[in-house]
Amino acid sequence: MEFLERTYLVNDQATKMYAFTSDRERGQKPVNKDQCPGDGPERPEAGAIYHCHNSFKATGNRSSKQVHAKWRLCAASAICFFFMVAEVVGGHVAGSLAVLTDAAHLLIDLTSFLLSLFSLWLSSRPPSKRLTFGWYRAEILGALLSVLCIWVVTGVLVYLACERLLYPDYQIQAGIMITVSGCAVAANIVLTLILHQRHLGHNHKDAQANASVRAAFVHALGDVFQSTSVLISALIIYFKPDYKMADPVCTFISSVLALASTVMILKDFSILLMEGVPKGLSYNSVKELLLTVDGVISVHNLHIWSLTVNQVILSVHVATAASQDSQSVRTGIACALSSSFDLHSLTIQIESAADQDPSCLLCEDPQD
């Protein structure tokens, strides 16, 4: 059986749909594929094929998100650099390892911000014949590299804290430590507000946060708690100078918080790199939705994965009756999916119900 590929936009969004048409459909007049049943008048067919370059939304959707992400990361980088220098100077003068630990984490954040900006630039590059999906996953690689930086620096700081516990021959200027750590708390709160992305609504189609900005936000949120713990230890040392061991103890606590902040990122990104179903989507719910479309008899070879956090891809094989208008089925599937989920790319292969083989292992549903 010979197949013909058709490409068009779904609901005028940056979503491509690829459908494979069998020989039995060749003589049928194609229907408008940009229009859901009950919508307004049909557009000119132009060969019944609509491409992404016919829509300004399609080309501008991704770039608009990139601009917002870059603005947030640039603003966060500037603030992070200024307060990092202030903490290095203040921590050195105060003799506080906890403050220097906080400065080191700001250095980690600054590095991660710069890596994220670089990865965003890479992800905006056009696809090539070797990288046909483009450079979207450069964002994920940049975020994972920043997590690795956290682990390395945290290990060094824990080692220094152990030395202070074993050899407590050091002095701390608690007054300077309070001033510097208080400013650090304020700076990290500002960073968190800049990087925070509000999500309006709770359905699957709400846009997910950019991967790089999300990783940076988690870093900044962890630093808020870390800076607060440094401030608390500074107050303890100020009122009880004999309790100066609170400084290395605070370093241990901050290190644990920093490592804990990376666990969720690693979990989500590992699933993404393993081509798992994106967070917020359910395999069963997508299949059930497809089976509700008129003309759909069965669904198999359903695959859902992501290029990056906000670039979801779906491909599926759908069986229909021989008398069913496959173009109408495709239109129904496109409308159902695009109204419920935010998809970057959609591929549908229409097959005849008579060609289905119940014993085919590839057509079986995956395990739970």
UniProtKB/Swiss-Prot annotation:
S-S bonds: none
One Gene Ontology term of the molecular function aspect: metal ion binding
Function: Proton-coupled zinc ion antiporter mediating the entry of zinc into the lumen of pancreatic beta cell secretory granules, thereby regulating insulin secretion.
Pfam families assigned: Cation_efflux (PF01545)
Keywords on record: Antiport, Cell membrane, Cytoplasmic vesicle, Ion transport, Membrane, Metal-binding, Transmembrane, Transmembrane helix, Transport, Zinc, Zinc transport
Record's protein name: Proton-coupled zinc antiporter SLC30A8
Motif (HCH Motif): 51-53
Topology versus the membrane: Multi-pass membrane protein
Induction remarks: Down-regulated by IL1B and IFNG.
Residues annotated for Zn(2+) 2 binding in this entry: C52, H300, H317, E351
BP GO annotations: insulin processing; insulin secretion; intracellular zinc ion homeostasis; positive regulation of insulin secretion; regulation of vesicle-mediated transport; response to glucose; response to interleukin-1; response to type II interferon
Originating species: Rattus norvegicus (Rat)
Residues the entry annotates as binding Zn(2+) 3: H51, H53, C360, C363
Note: Each subunit of the homodimer independently transports zinc ions in a pH-dependent manner. The cytosolic pH promotes binding of zinc ions to the transporter binding site. Upon change into the organelle-facing conformation, the two histidines of the zinc-binding site get protonated at lumenal lower pH, triggering zinc release into the organelle. The transporter then moves back to the cytosolic-facing conformation where the two histidines get deprotonated at higher pH, resulting in a net antiport of 2 protons.
Chief site of localization: membrane
Family statement: Belongs to the cation diffusion facilitator (CDF) transporter (TC 2.A.4) family. SLC30A subfamily.
Ranges per topology, Cytoplasmic: 1-78, 124-139, 196-216, 267-368
Transmembrane segments: 79-99, 103-123, 140-160, 175-195, 217-237, 246-266
Gene Ontology cellular component list: cytoplasmic vesicle; plasma membrane; secretory granule; secretory granule membrane; transport vesicle membrane
Residues that hold Zn(2+) 4 according to the record: H344
Subunit composition and interactions: Homodimer.
Tissue-specificity statement: Expressed in endocrine pancreatic islet alpha and beta cells. May be more abundant in beta cells than in alpha cells. Expressed in cubical epithelium lining thyroid follicles (at protein level). In the adrenal gland, detected in the cortex, but not in the medulla (at protein level).
